[in-house]
Amino acid sequence: MSNAYPDKHLKLFSLTSNTAIAEKIAKVVGVPLGKLSSRQFSDGEIMINIEESVRGNDIYVIQSTSYPVNNHLWELLIMVDACKRASANSVNVVIPYFGYSRQDRIAAAREPITAKLVANMLVKAGVDRVLTLDLHAVQVQGFFDIPVDNLFTTPLFADHYTNLGLYGEDIVVVSPKNSGIKRARSLAQYLDAPIAIIDYAQDDDSSREEGYIIGEVAGKKAILIDDILNTGKTFAESAKIVERGGATEIYAVASHGLFASGATEILQAAPIKDILITDSVYTEQELPSNLHYLSASELIGEAIIRIHERRPVSPLFAYNRKGDEA
């Protein structure tokens, strides 16, 4: 959408974590990013000044809570407070990557459920709605007492691979761990492809090279899919296992690219032809030469328009391959 959006009560603001995707989203919606200043004092305190009126407006604040997670989370909370105190009609937060979503349960004695704590903080600050992209655990939506729209990236990936001719029985979609079966099955259904799963006798880093494949990958082009690419170890070890299993080509796709230190070297050494991620996270880390970005801005921008116009977002979850009947 390139034309100016007609409703002047819709305003978008970008905080500092990922201004690149925010600018793209603004172009899709047809609304320029609002003016604000965000700075830190010498002791680390954050100060935000909204440099235009938001009174009576529906505000959408775009901020991924990625590295440095706590700085970006606090910046978001402070911005929400500023909007509420400036008499905004509604404050909606757009969080392409939702940090702390991996801490969604008590996995060992005396651990916190930090995803719930973050949800409480956002609600208490005055957030009216959350729009996010591929939560690590979909049950995090239930931690909020406000509406949460969790958009899926699988249709974007399906469209990308279909355009490359990567669909049908010659393709296999591989989940690199059993917790990702649902995600792999979703992409496989879109691509009319079978799935395979890599499982391990023990679920720890020391046994990653000892994984075994459930399903058939021999003679097929394999697409590894995960939600978060952090250290690169999961993809790298899974690619080696799939290569030993007889896959002819190996692709990897993830919703969020965090790229911890050393991830690029690990991925460069892996037998992966192409890595695909969305632009939900901005990073200054050196990236693998075989990495490509797929922007989620159009998906998020269309969701913002639909939410503002009180139209359903459910059509954004559908995907029909070109040539298929709707």
Swiss-Prot record:
Q: What binding details are noted for the cofactor?
A: Binds 1 Mg(2+) ion per subunit.
As for subcellular location, the record says: Cytoplasm
Its Enzyme Commission number?
2.7.6.1
Organism placement in taxonomy: Bacteria, Bacillati, Bacillota, Bacilli, Lactobacillales
What's the protein here called?
Putative ribose-phosphate pyrophosphokinase 2
Q: Pfam families given for it?
A: Pribosyl_synth, Pribosyltran_N
Q: In which pathway does it act?
A: Metabolic intermediate biosynthesis; 5-phospho-alpha-D-ribose 1-diphosphate biosynthesis; 5-phospho-alpha-D-ribose 1-diphosphate from D-ribose 5-phosphate (route I): step 1/1
Catalyzed reaction equations? D-ribose 5-phosphate + ATP = 5-phospho-alpha-D-ribose 1-diphosphate + AMP + H(+)
Q: Which gene encodes it?
A: prs2
Q: What does this protein do?
A: Involved in the biosynthesis of the central metabolite phospho-alpha-D-ribosyl-1-pyrophosphate (PRPP) via the transfer of pyrophosphoryl group from ATP to 1-hydroxyl of ribose-5-phosphate (Rib-5-P).
Q: How does it assemble?
A: Homohexamer.
GO CC terms: cytoplasm; ribose phosphate diphosphokinase complex
Summarize where D-ribose 5-phosphate binds, as residue positions.
Answer: 226, 230-234
Q: What is its main location?
A: cytoplasm
The UniProt family comment states: Belongs to the ribose-phosphate pyrophosphokinase family. Class I subfamily.
Its BP terms in the Gene Ontology are:
5-phosphoribose 1-diphosphate biosynthetic process; purine nucleotide biosynthetic process; ribonucleoside monophosphate biosynthetic process
